[in-house]
Amino acid sequence: MDRKGKGKQVAGSDSYSGGQKRKNSVEFRDEGLRIKKRKNPEVLQFFEESAEVGYYGGSSDEDDDGLGFLNDMEDEPEVEESSKAGKGEKGKSSFVFPKEEDLNEEEFDRIMEERYKPGSGFLRYADDDIKDAIEMDALAPTSKDPPIWKVKCAIGRERRSVFCLMHKFVELRKIGTKLEIISVFSVDHVKGFIFIEADKEHDVLEACKSLVGIYATRMVLLPKAETPNLLTVQKKTKKVSEGTWARVKNGKYKGDLAQIVAVSDTRNKALIKLIPRIDIQALTQKYGGGVTVQKGQTPAPRLISSSELEEFRPLIQVRRDRDTGITFEHLDSLMLKDGYLYKKVSLDSISSWGVIPTKDELLKFTPVDRKETGDVEWISEIYGEERKKKILPTCREGGKGEGSGGGKGEGSGGGKGEGSRGGKGEGSSDFKSESSYELYNLVCFSRKDFGLIVGVDDKGDGYKVLKEGIDGPVVVTVGKKEMQNGPFDSKFTALDLNKKQISVNDVVKISKGPSEGKQGVVRQVYRGIIFLYDESEEENGGYFCCKSQSCEKVKLFTEESNEKTGGFDGTAFEDFVSSPKSPLSPEKEWQPRERYNSSNQGDIGSTYSIGQKLRIRVGPLKGYLCRVIALRYSDVTVKLDSQHKIFTVKSEHLAEVRDRNTVLSTSGDAGTGSFQPFGMLGTESSTGDWAIGAGTSSEGGNWNIGGPSTDSHESLNIERNMVQLCREKNPWGGSKPTSDVSPTVADDNTSAWANAAAENKPASASDQPGGWNPWGKTPASEAGTVSGWGDTSASNVEASSWEKQGASTSNVADLGSWGTHGGSSGGNKQDEDSVWGKLCEASESSQKKEESSWGKKGGSDGESSWGNKDGNSSASKKDGVSWGQQDKGSDESKGGSAWSNQCGDFGSGKKKDGSSGWNKSAEDSNANSKGVPDWGQPNDGSSWGKKGDGAASWGKKDDGGSWGKKDDGNKDDGGSSWGKKDDGQKDDGGSSWEKKFDGGSSWGKKDDGGSSWGKKDDGGSLWGKKDDGGSSWGKEDDGGSLWGKKDDGESSWGKKDDGESSWGKKDDGGSSWGKKDEGGYSEQTFDRGGRGFGGRRGGGRRGGRDQFGRGSSFGNSEDPAPWSKPSGGSSWGKQDGDGGGSSWGKENDAGGGSSWGKQDNGVGSSWGKQNDGSGGGSSWGKQNDAGGGSSWGKQDSGGDGSSWGKQDGGGDSGSAWGKQNNTSGGSSWGKQSDAGGGSSWGKQDGGGGGSSWGKQDGGGGSGSAWGKQNETSNGSSWGKQNDSGGGSSWGKQDGGGGGSSWGKQNDGGGGSSWGKQGDGGSKPWNEHSGGGRGFGERRGGGGFRGGRNQSGRGGRSFDGGRSSSWKTDNQENTWKSDQSGGSDWKKGWGEDSNNSKPSGSSAGGCAGNWPSWDTNSKKETNDKPGDDSKSAWGTSNDQVNTDNNNDSWNKKPNNDVGTSGEADNAWGGKTNAVAPSPSGSAAWGTGDKKTGW
């Protein structure tokens, strides 16, 4: 019942549910049959099969009685009905199992037919919605398909990458992680890519992560349209057969015809044959010169003969191709054979469809017709025997077989017969290359090495070969079997240091490297290495080698070719002349080359080299480029690459092809090329030498800093740089105003240093070494500008200091003066150190900003002093010029010559009227100027380094500036110091310090007995020129120092040397001019105790004695700055140490003496040179061999003249100013005198003789005063003893009776000491009433002689208690007068007073005014003693009536004898006083009893 009820329930009410279950089961079964479309893909199929089996076998709850099958069969009709109903709805039938009783045969057939009919839905679900999804046309992608990503992978690893992704997918699925990609595949014909099917790009990145060889970031989405082609099997291949023609699609050979030699279908490549486009010269440069060849124009296609490859024979490798079996010559990754180039290219890179070559192209590929059987027989008959003779030695020499060297001919190793097919020429070269090795033959060995045979090995089985190694030429031993004959037929060329072509027989000089300096004739050239021969060489038979870039071509084909060319000098036409740059007519354009070649008929090889590129000049092929392949006298065989033609032309019909950027050489001597060309604006392309600053920077150009010296001051480099200095820069390192940049330099710019460009051309030419070209020279084109010491003056544009480049405006802040930093006008010191060799810092001036310099350019209306510029230059001021400045205001015809003047040059010995200023030309002489400029100072109120009208004294800054001190620039009442320009309107512009006057010698002018500065005298040397016995300034000499150069044992000017002082250098014993002292004081006030002339403290030896004397300064305590520097030590007033002393910034060891920073051993010299003249005056820094004048800073070998800062070699009277006097009598200025008699100025005198200026006299009656008569009868030296009593010694105690010393007690009767208390009770001259201050306000403590100052004992001041310093009781004549009209000690000391002074203000020494130091007093003053003492210091007096007082410093007096009253005027004056004057101010070498000097 239960069962029945159950069955009823199944058949009845539950029929739907049972049908549904069965229906679902059928679907599930069908789904199990259709696994790809199963709805639950995660359920495995065998579970489905098990469920089906369990279903048909009966369920567990319904098959207990085994009646389940029957129950199911009872339910089938209902299910069938339901299925039929569904079939009626869907139009489809489901697989059912009908009842056996209801199923007949017809119905079964119908069911089977319906089930398996075509297009039936048997394999589909009954209720499937996507019944039409899978059909054959469904391969076309639709929008529903997932995208395909193209991912980059390593080439050749496409399949491996796909497998890795598949493996990763399976491995990750095992751990429950699923890669969100659908499929991945690769295609054979697409290299380097795989294809991944995924919905998102991120999924692809995740899948490819951590897989090597797959670059997922380089991913591209594949377009839908490309998918069918991608999935299509590619069975079509290109059908390319061997021997067909093709054209290259891209690259260098794009469009060229190619012949297919072999095809590899598997590799999709083909071997093609091309006409090569190879640049032989580029290859030569690449392998020979070692430089990377820049990509240039594509060479023309042409066949390459084996002879052209001979140069590269050691680099060529013969290899057999593994694919084709063909043997090729491999050179630089090129495969060459029979003149053709073979390449392996991809089939895609060539186009072989429809290629129709032209006849010319086919002609190039036509094989050579080798019908030469008869030719071979004919040649063998002629040359057969000779060939056997040639071959025999090779067998004896080690069995060199035929073709063992790779072959020379076309056969390329195929034997001698083939080698000789090229004709006689190739055959003969073949014999030569295969012959035995001879001495000095060029051979190759190993792979890339080559060299020259220079000997045979000791064992006899090898050769000694000279080759170029890493560190220079080396000799190696090479076995015979390792050696090969190279292509060494002397036809190769190379480029030298200047890019000039070097050929065989050229003479070259090695400029750098281990063999630097050697010179020889080129014997061999190969791959950038040249082998030279010099008969003077002993090693390796005179042969040596070097790289071509290390050489410099000395000359072209010279004497040898001249013999053949009938005297025509080939050097007149250098390489660049062959192709002039100027747009000349064709006839003129090629004329030089035509002449050269036509005259070179006898020279085998002409001027061309094999392989050189030329251009045809005439004929129908005019303009075509060709290459030289053979040379025979003037016949040149060339090949036209563009037309593949070979013919012979005359050499005059060819022209060299020049690069457009070739720079023409402007060398003075042909062929050297060492002289670099100038640019368009005169800038030299080569590196600057000394005296050239750092390039063309606006601040560079410091004289001793900046550009490094390329050579060790060789004269040629000096000359080159001097030319440049003249043209483009301030000659002393400063830059010339841009408005002056002129490319023109006159032919006579070869003037000496400090010589004019136009008129006075000395012997030194541009090709003469040592000629100082334009220093102090104005270019000829700049007539309107005047230059200072090597400086050019532009109108209203003022240049910089000496070794400072200044701005072009006059309002630039004052750049410190010579050796000092200019302080403000108020006297405030600057704390910065500034030396004379240092770029001066700009400082504010309370009045006006200005820049000054030693050698500063003066504007048209303003003149600068020696090293200073006045920023306030205006036309209203009188142009008093300083030492080193033009005298514009001199109306005198001979108004002041320049120290190395432009017109009357120092080195010319020619006096030019109207020229003044140190190396300055008097361009415009204003009538309102009444005088000539002072030595470094405008005339009015300024002294030598001193400002007039109550200004500071010598070496002292007072209201304006001292020598090397900044001036306010707008002072009217006083001038600046020596090296400073005075703005004040002066009426009596004095002459320059080296001004030559009538009969007098100027400092740096040629005098009767002396030579001029920078002038070559008889037997003398030019300043800046080496003399036979001495050295020039700035030139190295034996025992001398180079100016600005370090020398052994000597110190250079501005250079530190051991134990010696240079100019601007502190020495242990010497002084430095413009150099900071070890004391290192930031300020140099003159009220400090123990300061010397240069402001050095008195703590040192001799109580802080400075170069100019004891520890005193020549200024008052209130003066802010010393003569040298605001901060730091002393400069040109530096302490002079122990014996040996120094000259003006230079030490002089012994009698050899040095000039201004230079020693002169020779006889005659210029400024700072020895003077060979015996009598007369000596020049400044000139040696006087005989008696007479003295030399400033020069040795005086004999006589009574003293040398200023120079040793006095002989005589009892000559003294050197600041130089040791090793003989008696002479005194040295600021130098210790070892021997008795001579004393130095401001130096202790070891012996009893002359005394120094402001120095104690160690010995008795021979002490001389500064400006005192000398012991000998024929002259006095500056600071020399006067034999006769009555004369006073300037700052010297007179051991003997008579005169008193200046600032020194006079033990004997007679004159009183100037600045010293006399025995008669007179007060010291200008002595301070209270306190022990000396002349320079030095305190009395410590030091020698109780703090005695330079010009007096301690406890005395020359400016104490009086309104003026160095003043007598009558206050008429002051050494430094406070009165407005008075002249000071330095007023006229190097200055000519042309205007008469007020009678009460005349300075001592020359009646009304001090005689100009180194100049002559032209105008008579209204003072009475004015007629008696006209002579200036270092000049002659032109007055004829003053016979016994025309003696000047450096000048021989006319009278040889005299007493103190009649004595010859010592330093610039006659001493008339024989008794102490009432005021104790005996004339120091003057005719005025009331004035010193």
Swiss-Prot record:
Residues 24-34, 81-92, 418-432, 586-596, 846-860, 955-1090, 1416-1430 have a biased composition (Basic and acidic residues). Residues 790-812, 866-875, 1156-1172, 1218-1231, 1270-1283, 1366-1382, 1392-1401, 1432-1442 have a biased composition (Polar residues). Residues 1-34, 54-96, 393-432, 578-602, 692-711, 728-747, 757-1493 are annotated as: Disordered. Residues 60-80 have a biased composition (Acidic residues). Transmembrane segments: none annotated. It is found in: Nucleus; Nucleus, Nucleoplasm. One of its GO terms (cellular component) is nucleoplasm. Residues 401-417, 1186-1213, 1235-1264, 1284-1321 have a biased composition (Gly residues). Sequence repeats lie at residues 732-741, 775-784, 789-797, 818-827, 836-845, 854-863, 866-875, 883-892, 917-926, 935-943, 944-953, 954-962, 963-972, 978-987, 1003-1012, 1013-1022, 1023-1032, 1033-1042, 1043-1052, 1053-1062, 1063-1072, 1073-1082, 1132-1141, 1144-1153, 1156-1165, 1167-1176, 1180-1189, 1192-1201, 1204-1213, 1217-1226, 1229-1238, 1241-1250, 1253-1262, 1266-1275, 1278-1287, 1290-1299, 1302-1311, 1314-1323, 1389-1398, 1433-1442, 1467-1475, 1484-1493. Residues 732-1493 are annotated as: 42 X 9 AA approximate WG/GW-rich tandem repeats. Keywords: DNA-binding, Nucleus, Repeat, RNA-binding, RNA-mediated gene silencing. It comes from the Eukaryota. One of its GO terms (molecular function) is RNA binding. Residues 239-266, 501-528, 607-634 form the KOW domain. Residues 757-767, 1122-1134 have a biased composition (Low complexity). Coiled coil: none annotated. One of its GO terms (biological process) is regulation of transcription by RNA polymerase II. A motif (Nuclear localization signal) lies at residues 21-28. Disruption phenotype: Decrease in the accumulation of several 24-nt RNAs. Reduced DNA methylation and released silencing of RNA-directed DNA methylation (RdDM) target loci promoters (e.g. LTI78/RD29A, YKT61/AtGP1 and AtMU1) without abolishing the siRNA triggers. Suppression of gene silencing mediated by ROS1 disruption in the double mutants ros1 rdm3-1, ros1 rdm3-2 and ros1 rdm3-3. Loss in non-CG methylation at DRM2-dependent sites. Reduced H3K9me2 at IGN5 and IGN26 loci. Effector of RNA-directed DNA methylation (RdDM) triggered by small interfering RNAs (siRNAs, 24-nt RNAs). Functions as an adapter protein that binds scaffold transcripts generated by polymerase V and recruits AGO4 and AGO4-bound siRNAs to form an RdDM effector complex. Promotes the expression of 24-nt RNAs. Required for the initial establishment of DNA methylation. Together with AGO4, required for transcriptional gene silencing (TGS) by DNA methylation and repressive histone modifications (H3K9me2) of several chromatin loci. Interacts with AGO4 via its C-terminal region and with RNA transcripts. Binds chromatin at loci subject to transcriptional silencing downstream of RNA Polymerase V, but independently from the presence of 24-nt siRNA. This is Protein RNA-directed DNA methylation 3. The gene is RDM3.
